[in-house]
Amino acid sequence: LIVPPCINKFYVLDLQPENSFVRHAVEQGFSVFLVSWRNPLASDTDGIDTATWEDYLQEGVLAAVQVVQDISRHERINALGFCVGGTLLASALALAHARGDHPVESLTLLTTLLDFEETGVLDVFVDETHAQARERQLGHGGLMSGRELATTFSFLRPSELVWNYVVGNYLQGQSPPAFDLLFWNSDGTNLPGPF
């Protein structure tokens, strides 16, 4: 089971045949299951805009674990989490463990933040004041746009992901080269505010 970040699309580990982790895993004999997170829209009327972290754990990760167990007929599965997908996966497995369930044989985490005491460069964008303002704005429902999330993450590496394109595209009139990872990075999803 691969749990990708819910702030981007699922295909980050399956961009093209020549650089696909999914393809490699299948070629090694693994049955691969990949979570595709829902992209909540403002027009949705089913309450997705009020979904919480706990909802993503229970109805997302733990439901996916159960599906993989059922289809594979294995009580314990291998799981890989990427970015915030890894944070969700680790949280879900901690919840399962607290309930006496141990559904995973092996756990692999890629670029996953688990200790939020020292968040590094993220502190530039998120501090307690900012978090409280977002809570007031979106804590009871609504969506944080994927575009806003992508812009924030681009500014974590402004030289490569912002100014390079300002100079090349705007000032020099160049077209940016096609690059699968940049396409994926700009193909974001919205998040429910309470999440």
What does each of the following model-derived ranges do?
Residues 2, 34, 78-81, 88, ...:
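Structured core elements
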Residues 2, 23-24, 86-90, 100:
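Non-catalytic peripheral regions of nucleotide-handling enzymes
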Residues 13, 44-52, 90-93, 118-122:
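Short acidic, glycine/serine/threonine-rich loops at helix termini
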Residues 65-85:
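Alpha/beta-hydrolase fold nucleophile elbow
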Residues 70, 74, 88, 92-194:
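Alpha/beta-hydrolase-fold enzymes
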